[in-house]
UniProtKB/Swiss-Prot annotation:
Signal peptide: none annotated. Its EC number is 3.1.-.-, 5.6.2.5. This is Protein PhoH2. Keywords: ATP-binding, GTP-binding, Hydrolase, Isomerase, Magnesium, Metal-binding, Nuclease, Nucleotide-binding, Toxin-antitoxin system. It comes from the Bacteria. Toxic component of a type II toxin-antitoxin (TA) system. The possible cognate antitoxin is PhoAT; the toxin gene can be expressed in the absence of the antitoxin gene in an endogenous mc(2)155 double deletion. Unwinds and/or cleaves 5'-tailed RNA in vitro that starts with 5'-AC, the reaction requires hydrolyzable ATP; double-stranded (ds)RNA and dsDNA are not unwound or cleaved. Has ATPase and GTPase activities.
Length: 437
């Protein structure tokens, strides 16, 4: 292979925190890790969400050190002739415009990449951090997001339509399920609008690959589905065999209301779980971190927890809410509390899951103990974590789990909020896709 064909990829810390073994995934190319990245990984070793990934990345570097003796010179990685080294030099800031010559870690990473490019190398800065990629573009460096863990997002909504004979719909209503050849290839738990001339029905594919009837009169804690998607979602939430339910959709489509009602139904009425635990990520609109807000932890959590209580106030009476809280049947916690816990006999709701990186989301799912279920609510158009793209995080988890009998996903379509809220949400959706990665 020619020297010109080999590219040089400079990795920042965000890449290694998302995939500790990222250095081994660049085929025959040269991977460069600036020294400041090692320092940033060290600083993240005890982070509540990212600490494990930082330690794994550092352990990988240490294993390479033990094998090769030193890392300041290229050492072989992978099976396709790629190399890796920790860059100690190329720290002359004069290659950058004056405005970028500072002591920030971003500036140090940019300096390494710019110096390597000045030597004639084909350099690409790889980062999951949007601001750093923008800065790289501002100084004329090629930059890209880390794609090795991306999945091809199919746009699967968990719903489909199917034309069938009127007799098939009659059979479905009479027997509660029907074996349809056209439905056997659909992912498990896909909702189906069955159209049979003048008659129609709603069903979903069960684990046996048969279509079972979804009743329109089912309710959870007094809440009934208004749309086909909501009715399928309710049916899935009431099915104890489905351990992970994903509810997507724009703001106001009823994701949180359905999840909370299903949780209260499970705890108070059906008693299949002991308590409802709601985890919310610590990202506000604008990305403000919880630690910068004044007050104790409970006071800091107030605004985050209040969003859950606002939803509950529209669904249950004050007396019911008081009973749930006084008996410890409802907890609203920051996601920092998940690591180290095993959640047994709990109905777990991960709210705003679109702001979670895939590794963090998998950590959450790994905490589930015996008798627990989890509901993920998310809207990928409202990501507050700049390290999460449209093709990773919860979107990647959905694509990986799609079709498994323990997993179901539904994208809710119809807004249940005021006409004003629906209008504004629609406008934001029209504006944002071109601007978002």
């Amino acid at each position: 292979m020619t020297e010109q064909a080999v590219r040089t990829y400079v990795l920042d810390t965000s890449v290694l925190l998302s995939d500790p073994w990222a250095c081994t995934r660049f085929a025959e190319h040269e991977v460069v890790v600036p020294l400041v990245v090692i320092s940033e990984l060290e600083a993240k070793r005890h982070h509540h969400e990212l600490g494990w990934f930082a330690r794994q990345a550092l352990r990988m570097f240490d294993d390479m050190r033990l094998e090769h003796g030193r890392l300041d010179q290229p050492v072989p990685v992978g099976t396709q002739g790629g190399t890796l080294h920790v860059e100690l030099n190329h720290s002359d800031p004069s290659v950058l415009p004056a405005g970028f010559r500072n002591d920030s870690n971003d500036a140090r990473i940019l300096t390494v990449a710019a110096n390597l490019a000045a030597e004639g190398k084909h350099v690409t800065l790889v980062s999951k951090d949007i601001p750093l990629r923008v800065k790289a573009g501002a100084v004329g460096l090629a930059a890209d997001e880390y794609h090795a863990q991306d999945v091809v997002v199919s746009g699967w909504t968990g719903m489909t339509e199917m034309d069938v004979a009127g007799e098939d719909i009659d059979t479905l209503f009479a027997d509660g399920e029907i074996d349809l050849a056209e439905a056997r290839d659909l992912p498990c738990h896909t909702g189906i609008r069955l159209l049979g001339g003048t008659s129609h029905a709603l069903g979903r594919v069960n684990a046996a690959k048969k279509v079972q009837l979804v009743r329109g009169d089912r309710e959870v804690f007094g809440l009934r589905g208004r749309s086909a998607e909501q009715r399928v979602a309710l049916d899935l939430l009431l099915d104890e065999s489905v351990g992970i339910v994903s509810l997507g959709g724009k703001a106001g489509t009823g994701k949180s209301a359905l999840a909370l009602c299903a949780g209260l139904e499970a705890v108070l009425e059906r008693r299949t779980q002991r308590k409802v635990v709601v985890f919310r990520p610590l990202y506000a609109v604008g990305g403000q971190d919880l630690g910068y807000l004044p007050g104790s932890e409970s006071e800091k959590m107030g605004p985050w927890a209040q969003a859950v209580f606002d939803t509950l106030e529209g669904l249950a009476s004050p007396a019911v809410l008081d009973e749930v809280l006084s008996r410890g049947m409802l907890e609203v916690l920051p996601l920092t509390h998940i690591r180290g816990r095993s959640l047994h006999d709990s109905f777990v709701i991960v709210d705003e899951a679109q702001s979670l990186e895939r590794n963090v989301l998998l950590t959450v799912l790994s905490r589930l103990g015996a008798g627990s279920r989890v509901v993920l609510t998310h809207d990928v158009a409202q990501r507050d974590n700049l390290r999460v793209g449209r093709h990773d995080g919860v979107a990647a988890v959905i694509e990986k789990l799609k079709g498994h009998p323990l997993f179901a996903h539904v994208t809710l379509q119809r807004s249940e909020r005021s006409p004003i809220a629906a209008l504004v949400t629609e406008m934001l959706e029209e504006i944002s896709p071109g601007a978002l990665p």
